[in-house]
Amino acid sequence: MKQQILDILVELEKWRAERKLSTESQREGYIRNVMEELGELAEAIKTNSEHEYIDALCDIVVFAGNCVNKEKFDEAFIPWETMEESFVNLHEDTLLKSMFANASEMTHSPNISIASLYSFCKDLAAKKGYDFFKCMKEVLKQINSRTGAWNEDLKKWVKDTSPKAKSKEYQADFDKCKLN
């Protein structure tokens, strides 16, 4: 799991660099942005939409990962490795509550929280039959294909939703991320 998270953090670091964003700028709007994604997750649960559910989990990890300095991640990960296995058999409701609590801790200790948040999301995706790392790679392809601009009021990168931009945007294909 550690290498998967590091791979994601490297991709997010490239994404931020291309857009001249910093982890600090990402932390400023984190709570509002992740709350929006949690709302999308709740809607996906309500409507039983698997793809929207997976997309919301991935977006939560994207927002969280954009708050993390990958150089400091290594030292924070060591204590988490010993606890990860104990979460695999938790009920989905417990995982969701734990993920929500952990997502709100990102602003205080992002380098530790990303490991637990990723683990919760990975387990939630697995319960729906998806390989979360493959899903994350699909979402990273999608966000890398987007154009847009930083919105200072929202404290986030806002994608261009024009028809031209939408026609060029890669769409994450979660069907190829199913567990065997």
Where are these regions (language model features)?
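Flexible "arm" and connector segments at domain edges
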Residues: 1-180
